[in-house]
């Protein structure tokens, strides 16, 4: 993404990891289509790509993608970089993949803290939709979106004074879907719903409440909504209730 473009070495590592994920995704699609020849080719491509791991050069986005591609152990990545300095180094688009990598390391509580700190800072500044870009350092001594600054103000304008690349200043979009990573992360790792077969004919429900007291949500499927409710009991255990359409096979994790 744009914010990672200043780190070419890390960017190379991230693109390589993405290519691995693409080949694995293609293998899965071709298997679903019963095209064994193309599935085998995609599998071989992924195997060849995974024989080399590029250095991430301190880029959290690249290391997160390497975790998701199976190139790097999730817990080692957390200890080395992903668990350090809070949300410094996050970006709106690839922040989702950092959250996923944290989920794979069983650090849902830390990931939720990151959501509060990074996306929560946008809310504190008046956001009503997801922003195209955001750096946590912008939040220091800046105005809210609906605040009119006097000419002699010592504050910065959160909209007009930041942004970059092709979206400097007021060209910076304050309604950008690519920054909505917390939404799927909450479905996948807190509610814990993940498809196991194409078309959601079979799904895994393996919730993790993290440091939340409760969570409730729905996940859409071709057969209707899966509904899940999680609540922490006084003894620390988590009560899980769910319902799923009859045509969906549910596996509890």
Regions found by a protein language model. Give the residues of each.
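Secretory-pathway/luminal and periplasmic proteins that interact with or process carbohydrate-rich
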Residues: 51-57, 121-125
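Sec-exported extracytoplasmic/periplasmic mature domains
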Residues: 28-31, 54, 103-104, 116-120, ...
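The feature captures the catalytic groove of carbohydrate-active enzymes
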Residues: 1-47, 55-100
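Secondary-structure transition/capping motifs at alpha-helix termini
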Residues: 33-36, 72-76, 105-110, 121, ...
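Non-catalytic C-terminal accessory modules of carbohydrate-active enzymes
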Residues: 44, 113-253
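Generic structural signal for hydrophobic core residues of well-folded globular domains
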Residues: 69-72, 102-105, 134, 190
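Repeat-solenoid scaffold signature
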Residues: 86-125
